[in-house]
């Protein structure tokens, strides 16, 4: 019988998948993994066999961190690709540690664009609760942004900001 050798990529993917499987065995509730933002070459670059790992998880967590989202097409494109590629739900994370009005405006418009995708959730990474309030207050008090949401049909964002307006 001829011995079959695994390629480096196959061996690494099996090793990572086994690690995820072992970790899942230790978890009693929902189980998710955070994956690097490369939906195309995840196996080759990181040893992630997304189909095999998808059989083990309840959802995938995809962080798309950035210092700002002034140019947001990359975040929308990657999010769309992950939703299309993965066979489990996707939870997207964006960075919200944005102290300037311009950065908050770009962040919230990016959230609006990705909210049109079939994501389970969009998480905003913040430093503290004041940072969270800053994001919400900016959205509530910025009539131009709220008008932009309405003009371009971002009904879900309008609903969310209207809810924030009851608190802020």
Features from the language model and the residues they span:
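N-terminal cationic-hydrophobic initiation segments that often serve targeting/anchoring roles
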Residues: 24, 54, 83, 114-115
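Surface-exposed amphipathic alpha-helices with a cationic face
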Residues: 20-31, 80-90, 143
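Substrate-binding cleft of secreted/luminal carbohydrate-active enzymes
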Residues: 56-79, 88-168
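Long, low-complexity, intrinsically disordered polar/charged segments
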Residues: 1-10, 83-97
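Generic recognition of flexible, low-complexity loop/linker segments
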Residues: 23, 48-50, 78-81, 110-111
């Amino acid at each position: 019988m001829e011995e079959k050798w695994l390629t480096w990529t196959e061996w690494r993917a099996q090793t990572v998948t086994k690690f995820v499987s072992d970790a899942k065995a230790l978890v009693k509730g929902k189980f998710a993994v955070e994956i690097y933002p490369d939906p195309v070459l995840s196996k080759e670059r990181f040893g992630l066999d997304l189909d095999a790992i998808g059989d083990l998880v309840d959802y995938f967590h995809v962080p798309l961190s950035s210092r700002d989202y002034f140019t947001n097409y990359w975040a929308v494109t990657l999010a769309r690709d992950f939703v299309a590629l993965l066979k489990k739900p996707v939870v997207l994370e964006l960075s919200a540690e944005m102290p300037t009005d311009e950065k908050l405006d770009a962040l919230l418009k990016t959230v609006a664009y990705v909210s049109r995708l079939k994501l389970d959730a969009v998480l905003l990474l913040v430093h503290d609760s004041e940072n969270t309030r800053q994001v919400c207050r900016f959205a509530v008090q910025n009539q131009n942004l709220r008008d932009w949401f309405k003009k371009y049909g971002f009904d879900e964002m309008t609903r969310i900001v209207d809810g924030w307006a009851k608190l802020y």
